[in-house]
Amino acid sequence: MSQSLFIGLMSGTSMDGVDAVLVDFDTPSPKLIATHTEAIPEHLFKGLQRLCQPGQDEVNRLGRLDRSVGSLFAKAVNNLLASSGIDKSQVVAIGSHGQTVRHMPNLEVGFTVQIGDPNTIAAETGIDVIADFRRKDIALGGQGAPLVPAFHQQIFAKADKRRVILNIGGIANITWLPGNAEAVLGFDTGPGNTLIDGWIQQVKQQAFDRDGAFAASGKTDNTLLAQLLSHPYFMQPYPKSTGRELFNNAWLEQQLEKFGHLDEADIQSTLLDLTCHSIAADILKLSNSGELFVCGGGALNIELMNRLQALLPGFTLTTTSVLGVDPKWVEAIAFAWLALRHHQGLPANLPAVTGARREAILGARFPAA
């Protein structure tokens, strides 16, 4: 068996598919061997959306979905390997993020729940699985998120450069790499794609706003934007993390109650500006200038990138592709790396980012045997 091949599995708050990557860590920079995205069937997508909000019969629904999502993740792995020509015996382990259905780290007894049973993944792939990466950090008083800044630091930091790595998935998060390893920071800025995707799904039955064209056709309503930006989360100091628990369609409906006169495209534009303004405000608290590298689905949204650049004139803005990592796969590669860290017995959280009391080895191993 190779000792350097790992698989990473990621499905984020957008729930737009399971990203699977096969990565070779035998070189200084991770080498991407193969990629695959497994679509989430409509019935699973709807079930997951329901489970993200309090409701009836939650425990039974969670139990069923846990197994079903595990099988879906296993299917993603098997299809990835089939397309790569690599035998499962060559893979050391799978790093599975799972699907977050509740993230509540700030309660008196904080918790986070990711489903996608790793036992099922191990049984259906024949490969050891390392999963449950977030709860150790929460047990140590942390947010359990974001976890990718440690990976960003490992592969993107440069001693003489001030860099921001911006991941725009359903939720947006930033990693501040000021060139001094001791000063690395990271946190969730707020909604990324979750509200803009949700709105266009509702009014246009489209999965997402391609290139931001629908938003570009509208005009931002500054009164609504100011109301959205008044959410207490944006005033919270870091460390902080968030999810669909705060920013979801039900919250948006409440916010729109007095704005029924607005055109649908104007709302789309306003929601895009909510994402851009909340990101820019947090970046400007850290620095007025530097290099900004975007990854995640938001990197493909041309209008979003243009608006961000306008709000951050002191930054050169591009994607992680110029650093050698395709922006679509950064998070999935990060979970392959988290599996590698667990396998090596090395810590993978950054207490300055999550607020945990100390560094820790993250995750638990679920053997295929």
Curated annotation (Swiss-Prot):
Homology family: Belongs to the anhydro-N-acetylmuramic acid kinase family.
Residues that, per the record, bind ATP: G12, T13, S14, M15, D16, G17, V18, D19
Record carries keyword Signal: no
Lineage: Bacteria, Pseudomonadati, Pseudomonadota, Gammaproteobacteria, Alteromonadales
Gene3D superfamilies recorded: 3.30.420.40
The protein, known as: Anhydro-N-acetylmuramic acid kinase
Family annotation (PANTHER family): ANHYDRO-N-ACETYLMURAMIC ACID KINASE
Pathway assigned to this chain's UniProt record: Amino-sugar metabolism; 1,6-anhydro-N-acetylmuramate degradation; Cell wall biogenesis; peptidoglycan recycling
Enzyme class (EC, first level): transferase
Alphabetically ordered keywords of this record: ATP-binding, Carbohydrate metabolism, Kinase, Nucleotide-binding, Transferase
Catalysed conversion reaction: 1,6-anhydro-N-acetyl-beta-muramate + ATP + H2O = N-acetyl-D-muramate 6-phosphate + ADP + H(+)
NCBIfam families assigned: PRK09585.1-3 (NF007139), PRK09585.3-2 (NF007148)
Function (record text): Catalyzes the specific phosphorylation of 1,6-anhydro-N-acetylmuramic acid (anhMurNAc) with the simultaneous cleavage of the 1,6-anhydro ring, generating MurNAc-6-P. Is required for the utilization of anhMurNAc either imported from the medium or derived from its own cell wall murein, and thus plays a role in cell wall recycling.
Gene Ontology molecular functions: ATP binding; kinase activity; phosphotransferase activity, alcohol group as acceptor
Database matches in Pfam families: AnmK (PF03702)
Taxonomy, superkingdom: Bacteria
EC number: 2.7.1.170
Gene Ontology terms: biological process: 1,6-anhydro-N-acetyl-beta-muramic acid catabolic process; amino sugar metabolic process; peptidoglycan turnover
